[in-house]
Amino acid sequence: MASDVRVRFAPSPTGKLHIGGARTAIYNWAFARANGGTFILRIDDTDPTRSTDENAQIILRAMRWLGLDWDEGPEVGGDFGPYAQTERLDLYKQAAQKLWDEGKAYPCFCTKEQLDADRKAAQERKDPFQGYQRRCRDLDPEEARRRIEAGESYVLRIKVPEDRGDVVIHDAVHGEVT
């Protein structure tokens, strides 16, 4: 019987495989094998200034040296490719657009400098910084589209309901966590 277990290791090809990455790969591989699952290798090549194909090949060789094989990924393919993050950008853009279209996400135009200033002001007031202040959450969608079309930089943020109360998840190790 096939297992539903699917685990992924996504090293960044910005250098050689380091000990922490090797440990994570070994744990994921062992978990997949122990549960009859699938071990997926996906290359996280999203740092264009430091990622290289040569480093990706070095990582693949290191994983083979460790005795690790992968069921899906570079050189072996699979049903859920591509297996390099930069080749998946269209998939991510489609998913992000869907979230925005459904009202589950919104564009934020706050600059790094604005966010740093918010953090610094909270520190000066000795207030605990509560993170992003949702400044762009309720922007008119047409204004947001105009700003995007004008080439203004933005990120897409998840539109978490404001009246959600505590978010509680079940963690397999820690139980209920808020």
Feature annotation, model-predicted:
Residues 1-124:
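N-terminal Rossmann-like or analogous alpha/beta NTP/dinucleotide-binding catalytic cores
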Residues 106-107, 111-178:
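Active-site cores that bind ATP or allylic diphosphates and position pyrophosphate for catalysis
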